[in-house]
Amino acid sequence: ESYLFCFEQPHDFLIYDKSYDLAGHRDISEFEYINDVGVKFYWATAVFFRKNETNKIFFDLLQHIQENWNHYRLVFQVGENLLRNDHVFSIAIHIMNGYQHGNFANKMPGKLFYTLDKDICWEISDNEITFLLEKQKYHGEYTLCKWKEHSIHVMNKYSLNRCIDKMEL
């Protein structure tokens, strides 16, 4: 429902810059900035954009950054070799803002909830997902959590695929 708001507002590009870990106890600093020099983190999970010349430049820039990832990850001091679309989007937004905080990207409506790859998607049924969330200070031990009627970004794709494969279609 909150995504319908995207079509009623005046901005041409919306993206999440804040997120909420379902476990609620973990360090989320890696999802605030992509590096120590202050490039803000944006989630490429859900994006709204209107087709226009500015956004065409943005998406061309995304492709350029992806094709030249090793250069950009060194320039922007991204510690990981692994290409993450979140990092590519974050760098492109930073460039579109003139290498500073700016207003190219506006906030998506609602909240972006997520589970980490340490968490296990256990079951999907109707409008409910059951997770096993890794406990704080007890690696390998989990807390049962049921998530109902809200979107969520699941980072453990292996367990998500297992649940999808078990679903009756």
Predicted segments, located by residue:
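A glycosyltransferase accessory/donor-loop signature
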Residues: I34-L169
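GT-A fold catalytic core of metal-dependent nucleotide-sugar glycosyltransferases
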Residues: E1-H25
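Short acidic (Asp/Glu) patches
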Residues: L22-N35
